[in-house]
UniProtKB/Swiss-Prot annotation:
LRR repeats lie at residues 231-254, 255-277, 279-300, 301-326. It is found in: Cytoplasm; Nucleus. Keywords: Cytoplasm, Exonuclease, Hydrolase, Leucine-rich repeat, Magnesium, Metal-binding, Nuclease, Nucleus, Repeat, RNA-binding, Transcription, Transcription regulation. Residues 1-100, 132-235 are annotated as: Disordered. Disulfide bonds: none annotated. SUPFAM superfamilies: DNase I-like, L domain-like. One of its GO terms (biological process) is nuclear-transcribed mRNA poly(A) tail shortening. This is CCR4-Not complex 3'-5'-exoribonuclease subunit Ccr4. Residues 86-100 have a biased composition (Gly residues). It catalyses: Exonucleolytic cleavage of poly(A) to 5'-AMP. It comes from the Eukaryota. The gene is CCR4. One of its GO terms (cellular component) is P-body.
Amino acid sequence: MFYPHHQSQQSTTTNPSKHHDSQDVRLPGTSSWSRHPSHPSFTPSLPMPSPSGYPPLGSGYPPGGHHHPNVNVHSGIHGPHPSFGSGMGGNGGMGHGQGFGMGMFQNGVQTSPPRGEPVPMTSHWQTQMMRAEASRSASSPHHRARAAAISSRATNKPAAVPIVDPNNRPSSSYGTNGLHRKNASSVFNGEPTGTPPLSDPSLTPAQNPAEPATPAPVAGQTESKDEEKPNEPWTGLDLGGIRLKRLSTALFSFTHVTSLYINHNALTSIPSAISSLRQLTLLDATGNELSTIPSEIGVLSKLKDLLLFDNNLTTLPFELGTLYQLDCLGIDGNPMNADYRKKLVEDGTRGLITYLRDHAPPPPPPPERQWIDLETDVDTPTSGKQESFSVLTYNILCASFAPATTYSYTPSWALDWDYRKRLLLEEIVTASADVVCLQEIDCKQYADYFYPMLKKEGYEGQHYPRSRAKTMSVDEQKLVDGCATFWKEEKFRLVETQVIEFNQLALQKTDMRTEDMFNRVMSRDNIAVVAALEFRASGGRLLVANSHIYWDHRYRDVKLVQIGMLMEELEKIVEQFSRYPVKLDTDPEYNNGKPPKYERSEKGRDIPLIMCVDLNSFSGSAVYDYLSSGSIPGDHEDFMSHLYGRYTASGLKHHLGLRSACAGIGEMRMTNFTPTFAAAIDYVFYTPRTMKVTSVLGDVDKAYLDKTVGFPNAHFPSDHIPVFTQFRIKGHLDPLPLNGDPYH
C-alpha cells in the first residue's frame, strides 16, 4: 500500500493511544509505513526480494536464475539489414550464409536466417512460420493499407476505408474473456455481449460459489470512469515498407489505434512512448534493424499479435510477461536466445510469456501513498477532549476468486495465497487502524489466519459469511467469503453485532414480493455486518457497518434494492442502540467531564456512524447518490423498469445524513485496478453531524500505475487497495435545517 506514517496535528491532550503515535506496532528495521521486512510475528517469514532486486529462492518464488539467460549467438557476419524485398535482387537469391536477415527469394521476400540447429516442427513452430511468411510477404510500401482499399472496393464499400485489423482472428484460447473477473461476459465496443452466467435469475447462490465482486465494464465505459470511447473513424495505421529510420513522437498521440504496422523499415529502436498506445492489439515490426525492444511494451495488455520477425533481437524484456492476451509472439529470423526459442517451439507463445512473467524480477516499489489533511485534529474549549480514531476498509480478494486463468498477468508466486495473505496482514498491521473492515474474506482464512494473527496485535473481531453458507456442509462453508470487522480492544468494547442478509430481508417484505424481487434480488446473497462499539475511555458510541454490494452493473437495480434495505435496517439499529443505558464511569478528561448523552428525539441519528462498503459503483451512480443525498425517485433509470413494490412506487429515502470520507478530495482516482477496469468503488461513509474527517490516505503514485498492468502484483496483494481515513468526534451535534432533513 506504501503509505507514510501520518503525523497528526492533534493537540497534546489527545489520547496517546492513537494509532499513529504508538511505536510498538512498527515492523523492525523500517519506518512506520514501509512495507518490508516482514513483521516478526509472521510464520513463516514473508519472503522478500534480495538486495539484488530478484526474488529469493524459496517457496512461492520462481526458481533461481533471474538474469537473462546466456545468448546463443549463431556464427556469421552481420551484414546490412534489408528493409525492402522488391527491386533489390537480380536472378537468384542473395546469399543465405552470411548474417541475419540476408536470405531472400528471387521475388525479394525475406526468409528466416540460417540456424545452427534444426528446429523441431511442432504445431507451435508451424504457426510461427506461417505468420512469419505472411509478414515477409507484406514488404511493399503500405501493403496492408492497399490491401484494405482493394478489399473495400470489392465489397462496394467507400474507398476511404480505415484499416480494421486485417489479421484479426478469433480470441485466443489462452486468454480471458476480456474482463478482470471469472465468468463475466465479454464486451465489444462497450456493449455487453452474451448471457451473464452469474446473473441468470434461475441460478441460486449455492450454484455460484465464486461470484465475482467487481463490476463488469458498462456500456461506453469498459476501462475506467474517466475514459471515453474513441470516436475516430479509423483504428489502423500502416507505415510499412517506406524505409523509416525513426518514429516521430507525434505518432504516439493516436491513442485510439489498435493496429500499427511499422514493418520492413530501417528502424533501430522503438521509442518507449509506445506505452501510450494502450488500445493496440497488433504491432508488426518485422524486417527492421531492432536489437532491443522497449520494456514499456509490457503495459500494452491488449496486444494479441507482436510480430518481431527478421530483426537483430537476441533477448526479450521480462516485462512482456504481462501480455496475458498475446496469441502470437513472432521471433523467427532473429539471433534469439536459444532458451527462449526452445520455449516457444515447445510451449508456444503462451508458454514463453508465462516463463517471462514468472521469472521477472520484482519491479521497484512505488512511492508511499501520502496523507491528505482535510481538517485539524484538535480539541475545542467548548467540547473538551474528544475521541479520534482511524478506519481502514479493504477488499482482500478471496483466494477462490483469484484463479490463475483470471489474473494471468500476475506472476504465479505473487498470486499465490500464502504470499498474498502475508502481505495483506503486513499492510493491516503496519496501518494499525483502530477499526478494520475486510470484504471477501472466507471463513477458513478468518479463523485460521487473520483472527489469530490480528489478535496478537491487539484486535478483536467478528466475521459472517454469505447466506449460502447455511445450505452447505462444514467443509464447504470454510470456503465461503463474507465480511469481517476488527477493532482495537484497548480502544473499543463490543456491545453487539448484527448481520443483515439481503435475500432474507427480501423474503420478509410481503409488500414487495414481486417477480423481480424473487428472480433478481433473492438469488444474490450479499450481506452486511453491523458492530455496535463503545469507546472505553469516553463511553461514546460508534456504529460500524461493513458491507459488500452485488457486483454486476447490468443488475444495478439489485444494487439499489440492496442498499435501500441496508439503510432501512441501519435506521432501526441506530435507534435501538440509542436506547442502551449510558456509561457513567468515563474518563473525566473527555467531554468536559460529562457522560455521553443521546436524545431519543434523534432516534439514534446523534450516534456516530461509519459505513465501510465495497459498493461496486462509481461516485455519481444511483447507489452513491442515494447514500449521499438521502433519496432516489422510484422512476430512476437504474431501476431499469423493474418493479419492487414501494421502492419503485415512491422511491428510496433515508435520514442518516451520510457523506463519503473522500468526497472532500473528489474521491480516489481508483480503488480497484486491473487491465480492464480502474475506478473508485470502495468507500467509507460517515455522519458529518457527529464527526469530521481529519485526513485521508491519497492515491497510488500515478507514474507507478502507468508502468503497471494491474493488481495484484508483487507490491499489492489484492486487485483493490485499502481506503484509510482518520476521524474526530465533534462532541456536539450539528443542528438540522428547519425542515429536519439532514441533506437540505
